[in-house]
């Protein structure tokens, strides 16, 4: 056992390096997912029926199908559907962002509906353009209300990003799998990967609590 730990020690760093890859996908997905989610949420509360139908249909597709299937379609089927072969990174970033956008849109929609409608009516009475009402009055309050839910989405993205290993990306999970095959031991590599995921989630949760407290004070 002791000899194995000495032999396994250098491979720990190889696994931990995958943390950066996991973070890269998660951060990109949460940024673009937030943008997509905001646009969809605005469409969902819009009076235009066509926009509402489109946003609801989009959400139903990405919430109603597994992320693994979405990733597979974007990576393997895109050359046949749109004639473009995406790299593993692009396919992962697109799939995670589109999927995240669907979930974030529902969170933001709920946040928008939670804002007192009297503020919207008062702003309209002052002849403030609807775009500015949404951008400067409604969305800032909505984001403040839903901040914990957005953090939860980032946490979910960190864990769900492990499926990118299916395409051979050298993330935490893929590196742990490689070490498992090389050492004929699945316990320690997966334990190291699990610890890395746990530390990432705890760190993000800690930072989020600090930010949330400052938002409450402000």
UniProtKB/Swiss-Prot annotation:
Record-linked Pfam families: BPD_transp_1
GO CC annotation: ATP-binding cassette (ABC) transporter complex
Family from the record: Belongs to the binding-protein-dependent transport system permease family. HisMQ subfamily.
Localization: Cell inner membrane
GO MF entry, a single one: transmembrane transporter activity
Keywords, ordered alphabetically: Amino-acid transport, Cell inner membrane, Cell membrane, Membrane, Transmembrane, Transmembrane helix, Transport
Protein name (record): Putative glutamine transport system permease protein GlnP
Native source organism of the sequence: Rickettsia conorii (strain ATCC VR-613 / Malish 7)
Keyword set includes Protein biosynthesis: no
Membrane topology qualifier: Multi-pass membrane protein
InterPro entries on file: AA_ABC_transptr_permease_3TM, ArtM/GltK/GlnP/TcyL/YhdX-like, MetI-like, MetI-like_sf
Functional summary from the UniProt entry: Part of the binding-protein-dependent transport system for glutamine; probably responsible for the translocation of the substrate across the membrane.
Single GO biological process annotation from the record: amino acid transport
All copies of domain ABC transmembrane type-1, residue ranges: 19-208
TM spans (from-to): 25-45, 57-79, 86-108, 187-207
């Amino acid at each position: 056992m002791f000899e194995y730990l000495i032999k396994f020690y250098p491979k720990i760093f190889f696994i931990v390096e995958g943390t950066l890859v996991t973070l890269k996908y998660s951060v990109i997905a949460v940024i673009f997912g937030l943008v997509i989610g905001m646009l969809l949420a605005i469409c969902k509360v819009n009076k235009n029926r066509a926009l509402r139908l489109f946003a609801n249909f989009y959400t139903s597709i990405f919430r109603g199908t597994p992320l693994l299937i979405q990733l597979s379609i974007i990576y393997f089927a895109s050359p046949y559907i749109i004639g473009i072969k995406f790299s593993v990174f692009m396919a992962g970033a697109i799939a995670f962002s589109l999927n995240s956008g669907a979930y974030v849109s529902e969170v933001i929609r709920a946040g928008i509906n939670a804002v007192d409608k009297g503020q919207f009516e008062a702003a309209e009475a002052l002849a403030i353009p609807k775009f500015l009402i949404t951008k400067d009055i409604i969305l800032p309050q909505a984001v403040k209300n839903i901040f914990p839910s957005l953090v939860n989405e980032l946490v979910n993205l960190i864990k769900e990003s492990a499926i990118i290993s299916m395409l051979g990306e050298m993330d935490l999970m893929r590196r742990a799998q490689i070490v498992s095959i090389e050492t004929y031991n699945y316990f320690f590599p997966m334990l190291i990967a699990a610890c890395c995921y746990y530390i990432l989630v705890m760190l993000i949760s800690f930072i989020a609590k600090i930010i949330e407290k400052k938002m409450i004070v402000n």
